[in-house]
Amino acid sequence: MVKKLSEAEAKSTLGVAGDNTNNGQIRADEFLPELRGRKAIRKYREMRDNDSTVGAVMYAVEQILRDVDLHVKPANESDAAKVEKEFVESVLDDMEHTLDDHISEALGYLSYGFGWFEVVYKRRVGPTERSPKKHSKYTDGRLGIQKIASRAPWTVNKFDVDDKTGEVLGVQQSVGHMGGSNYIPTNKSLYYRTTSLNGDPSGRSILR
């Protein structure tokens, strides 16, 4: 007779999605050794930048996707939801760069399998403020977004992955040639990946 699960057992996570994906390495389950870790990022970058055919195809794909119109929709038809919709629109229109600029950078993740961006916030004090942490078109004092800063895939050393759940908690980023590193948590980031196949945090490059 099959044992009946307790509620605690039913809610627990027992297995993992892939053989090595929880170790946080880029493309840890990749069959070809030369396409594992940061070597994979270097190879895809070389293909994108040095192969004219690949570069042209990627450019065409990215241009098509950039032409898609984006709209902010309220959660429901209530007045409160409509007010928050307008607030979100104001936040996206009050960054150091345009939303189109971010989309253009974000589409680069297709080549590498994933894209990581750090969200830097600010207080919306007013247009006369010199500090980028306070400068804004608005004077409502609410929290806004200063910038959505790209963190290039070739600077990412590894993902911080929860051993039990496979949840991505953040990334370790290399800093220059001095051997330093930054830790960027997911809750301060925008994180894109092409696929969640096998729980791989680095996704899968469309060039693979």
Each model region followed by its residue ranges:
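Structured, contiguous alpha/beta core segments that scaffold functional sites
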Residues: A17-T21, E30-E34, E46-D49, A75, ...
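Extended, helix-rich architectural segments
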Residues: M1-T98
